Amino acid sequence: MKIGILGGTFNPIHNAHLRIAEEVRDRFDLGRVMFVPAASPPHKPLAGELSFDVRYRMVQLAIADNPAFTISDVEGRRGGKSYSIDTLKGLHSAFPHDEFFFIVGSDSFLDIGSWREYAAIFNLCNIVVVERPGAAVAALDAALPVAIAHEFCYYEAEKRLAHRSGYSVYSIAGTLLDISSSDIRELARLGRSIRYLVPQSVEHYIKEQRIYNDAR
């Protein structure tokens, strides 16, 4: 089976996350997309120190009506910093016969050279780079760290980098929904509407649990 992997803090999960997952699922004919909430992101502090369990629950609610969407608590169970390489190695071992498509924003891909064991990631999965507002990738080959650029062949017409492992890096435009989790947190803190920014079930959960009311 072809499985998409979408990681993030999901603080909170919002409609742009869901739309990205759906467009990648449709574009690459994925059997399912697995959402992987980060326990402790290594590149930025978790705003408000919202617990893993609360963020996990919001993702559960958000994807409940889509049978192609699943969730994994692999990073919560592992503890420590949530490095992508560790997660991908774990999933590769757990599902050795499946093919993974790791979904990342263009802003993250442009910074991939700073990730732990970044070069090894290309040996474990395909990567789908989704353009984000303000972080366009003009050419995938130019975005690669110099140290590993020789491991790829670039097919401009397909917007695809073929890696020597047999996996590829793809670039897609997607629907640019400029929705920010930090903006949603601030709106919720102020008691303003977050309707249509998050799924209704997540909106109700945030209100009922008063998740962001204390400016966490």
Swiss-Prot record:
The keyword Nucleotidyltransferase applies. It holds the Pfam family CTP_transf_like. One of its GO terms (molecular function) is ATP binding. Pathway: Cofactor biosynthesis; NAD(+) biosynthesis; deamido-NAD(+) from nicotinate D-ribonucleotide: step 1/1. InterPro entries: Cyt_trans-like (IPR004821), NadD/NMNAT (IPR005248), Rossmann-like_a/b/a_fold (IPR014729). Its EC number is 2.7.7.18. One of its GO terms (biological process) is NAD biosynthetic process. Transmembrane segments: none annotated. SUPFAM superfamilies: Nucleotidylyl transferase (SSF52374). Keywords: ATP-binding, NAD, Nucleotide-binding, Nucleotidyltransferase, Pyridine nucleotide biosynthesis, Transferase. It catalyses: nicotinate beta-D-ribonucleotide + ATP + H(+) = deamido-NAD(+) + diphosphate. Catalyzes the reversible adenylation of nicotinate mononucleotide (NaMN) to nicotinic acid adenine dinucleotide (NaAD). Belongs to the NadD family. This is Probable nicotinate-nucleotide adenylyltransferase. It comes from Geotalea uraniireducens (strain Rf4) (Geobacter uraniireducens).
